[in-house]
Structure formats: C-alpha cells, structure tokens
Amino acid sequence: MMKVLVVVALLVTLISYSSSEGIDDLEADELLSLMANEQTRKECIPKHHECTSNKHGRCRGNFFKYKCQCTTVVTQDGEQTERCFCGTPPHHKAAELVVGFGKKIFG
C-alpha cells in the first residue's frame, strides 16, 4: 500500500511539473504576442496624419479602425497627385456618438 502511495505521489508531481512548464510556455507566447501588438500600435498611423504611402497601417479609434481617405490634389504646375489622410468616416462618427450617448444614459 505504501509503494502505491509513493508511485501516485511521484506521478502527481511529474504531471503538475509538466503542466506548469506548459503554462509557462503559454504565458511566454502570450507575452511575445502582446509585445508584437504593442509594437504595431506604436507604428500605426494616427488620426489626421498622412497615409498615402501606407494605406493599411491605420490606428484604431474608440470603436473602429480609422479609414484612409484620399483626395486628388492639383498643384500649381497642373500635376495631379493623390494625398491620403487617416480619419473617421461620418457613419463611424455617428455610431460612436450613439454609443457614447447610450453609455451616458444607461451608465
């Protein structure tokens, strides 16, 4: 009976040790993922900044990702160039206004 208890105790110890290593690996992976997300957040293009060369690197607003809004600019020489900036589209502004108003009313 004593040998069975010793073997069970060893098995429980081995299982808990191996699962704790797995959890540590999982936490390390999550930490690396969070660090990568933080890095991309720092590199994203903020609101009202130019996004002509990188139309997909926009930052997130309160609820939605900003849109890269482009216009054609005609220079004094008559050349047409496309200029883009990050901004919030009107329908996103309206949705944010409604959600903000709802939060104020319903807490």
UniProtKB/Swiss-Prot annotation:
Tissue distribution: Expressed by the venom gland.
Cited InterPro entries: Spider_toxin_CSTX_knottin
Q: Which residues form a coiled coil?
A: none
The UniProt keywords, alphabetically, are: Disulfide bond, Secreted, Signal, Toxin
Q: Does the keyword Cell division apply?
A: no
Q: What is its main location?
A: secreted
GO CC annotation, single? extracellular region
A molecular function (GO) held by this record is: toxin activity
Q: List the disulfide bonds.
A: 44-59, 51-68, 70-84
Q: Which residues belong to the signal peptide in this entry?
A: 1-20
Which positions are listed as propeptide? Answer: 21-41
- Superkingdom of the organism of origin: Eukaryota
Where is the protein found, in the record's own terms? Secreted
- Pfam (any one): Toxin_35
**Family named by the database record:** Belongs to the neurotoxin 19 (CSTX) family. 04 (U1-Lctx) subfamily.
For this entry, the protein name equals U1-lycotoxin-Ls1h
